Amino acid sequence: VKGDVHDIGKNIVSVVARCNGFDVRDLGVMVNYDTILENINDFKPDVVGMSGLITPSLDEMISNLDKLNSDGYNLPVLIGGATTSKAHTAIKMAPNYEKGVVVHVPDASLVVGVCRELLNEETSHKYIDNLKDDQASTMKRYKNSKKINFVDIEEARSKKFKLNENNILNMTKNFNVNE
């Protein structure tokens, strides 16, 4: 995706998919949405994959999913890379792509199985329904989780430990330097 120059994982996925009979169009690194869209329209893929190694790539993937959704696409989108996770995909990504399905693929060795599940006309609906149910469950757990109320920075600063002569002496009185 745009902003990410890392390509090792993407390259491994491409090789694994090609070795298993899939036709792959590898767009390279630093790929913006317009290039992705142009290739979707030209190549007519069954599945789209996005990969990212750095944290800003997650926001770029979310933006791409939102645009794909707005543009009316419903292609399955595979998400992978070091910064991605099942929870992040369910909580932050999937809600931006309501017309399609977003699948977190944590390892290149799993991509062929996921693609076969998604492309199997007899079982893909069940696979997608189960995946979306799992993502909805993850989202529900997230929304119901205990919220941490952080203290405002000014309040935290006002409660900082204040050193003075008495508390310094109390802290050091049992510490014998001569031993």
Task: Go through the PLM ranges and name each one.
Residues 66, 70, 94-99, 116-124, ...:
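Generic secondary-structure signature for well-ordered alpha-helical cores
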Residues 107-179:
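Active-site loops and adjacent core secondary-structure elements that bind or stabilize anionic groups
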Residues 100-107:
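Short acidic-hydrophobic, aromatic-tinged amphipathic segments that line or gate anion-handling sites
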